[in-house]
Regions:
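C-terminal motif of bacterial Sec signal peptides marking the signal peptidase cleavage site
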Residues: 29-30
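Post-signal peptide N-terminal segment of mature Sec-exported envelope proteins
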Residues: 37-59
Length: 202
């Protein structure tokens, strides 16, 4: 947007002005303060995700973690445990069911439970591990993302990622920012210190 507005002003600007504008455009996203208000807690035992805002649980969502179990080894297709953070968010304003390949939209849009299809859809929340037990998470492309296989939400069915219904992942995506804390545990949410009873969205 900065570059577009500069073009509209004409081409008579100084070289220093253009250079400064280019640097600002390049690095402005990285200057955004990390989200310290939100905390995502995922229970592989319950197949549920709790969203915490400033210490208060504001909602829970059903999810689907790996059908291959837990772990962080390369090529294992398992869901890692432990402390992570939201590294990147991909899919702003993409329509519900928009298909992604290599984190880019293909132009295809799928309806929920489209037969024979299992791509990443709607939104991508890319996770980065913060501990030794999940240090490969970012390189393994571990995401929270939408799935067309909504019939399998609530049971382990993924290849390592955390799957959500498209409507739910849009809701989550619009609330949490980069840097938000993410914790994946192999215990019931009831055993995790989340305080007040959550309001269930579905």
């Amino acid at each position: 947007m900065i570059r577009g507005s500069l073009r509209e002003q004409g081409e008579g600007g100084s070289l220093g002005f253009w250079f400064a504008a280019g640097v600002l455009t390049l690095f402005l996203p990285s200057c955004v303060a990390p989200d310290r208000d939100h905390h995502i807690v995922i229970s592989t035992r319950d197949q549920k995700l709790a969203l915490v805002e400033k210490g208060i649980v504001i909602g829970t969502y059903p999810v689907s973690t790996s059908k291959f179990g837990l772990g962080d080894g390369q090529g294992t297709y398992r869901t890692p445990l432990g402390e992570m953070e939201v590294a990147q968010k991909i899919g702003d304003d993409a329509p519900l069911g928009a298909v992604f390949k290599d984190r880019r939209r293909t132009g295809e849009v799928l309806v929920p439970n489209a037969p024979g299809r299992d791509p990443i859809v709607t939104r991508i929340i890319w996770l980065r591990g913060l501990e030794a037990q999940n240090s490969n998470a970012f390189a393994r492309d571990i995401y929270i993302h939408g799935t067309p296989e909504e019939r399998n939400i609530g049971k382990p069915a993924s290849y390592g990622c955390i799957r959500m219904r498209s409507q739910d992942v849009i809701q989550l995506y619009n609330i949490v920012g980069r840097g938000a804390r993410v914790t994946i545990v192999d215990q019931p949410l009831a055993d995790v210190a989340l305080v007040p009873k959550p309001r269930v969205f579905r």
